[in-house]
């Protein structure tokens, strides 16, 4: 089991986007499902798009990669992931569970990834930060659609040996 915990935007200032007067017009332009209603953590549409809900933390978590805090037992994980390579859009061949949580200062992504292959067969040999080659390793990534337009945002990913990268996409 490969477990990862990414602390994103720490420390950060949280600024809400300007509210739009015409919410109906905005929702008509969004290609995908609305945010899930608690206790659900993911909402999918027939087109394969997904929207997830972040959980507000009521107790601190430790960034140790163990994912043993109560939140990971109390909140359903995000699951049902899809592949990018190989088989873009195919269901994941291995089990993956993820949680997105936040507090006043940070957003946290915790994930457990299982692999039926022994560790010696993992494709994870890149440790240089922010190198494109890292995408050719086994990895876990998360994209934040910060404008909720399915076109612009930031992407973070990590491999089993700790190599990591982030980039902005438009």
Predicted regions and their residues:
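Bacterial N-terminal signal peptides
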Residues: 1-13
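Structural preference for beta-rich elements and adjacent junctions enriched in aromatics
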Residues: 16-170
């Amino acid at each position: 089991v490969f477990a990862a915990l990414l602390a994103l935007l720490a420390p950060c200032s949280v600024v809400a986007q300007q509210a739009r007067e015409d919410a109906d017009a905005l929702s008509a332009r969004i290609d995908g499902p609305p945010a899930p209603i608690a206790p659900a953590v993911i909402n999918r549409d027939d087109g394969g798009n997904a929207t997830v809900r972040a959980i507000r933390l009521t107790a601190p978590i430790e960034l140790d990669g163990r994912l043993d805090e109560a939140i990971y037992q109390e909140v359903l994980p995000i699951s049902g992931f899809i592949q990018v390579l190989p088989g873009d859009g195919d269901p994941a061949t291995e089990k993956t569970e993820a949680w997105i949580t936040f507090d006043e200062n940070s957003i946290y992504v915790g994930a457990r990834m299982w692999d039926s292959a022994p560790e010696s067969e993992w494709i994870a040999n890149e440790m240089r930060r922010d190198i494109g080659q890292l995408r050719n390793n086994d990895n876990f990534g998360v994209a934040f659609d910060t404008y909720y337009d399915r076109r612009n945002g930031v992407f973070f990913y990590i491999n089993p040996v700790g190599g990591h990268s982030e980039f902005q996409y438009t």
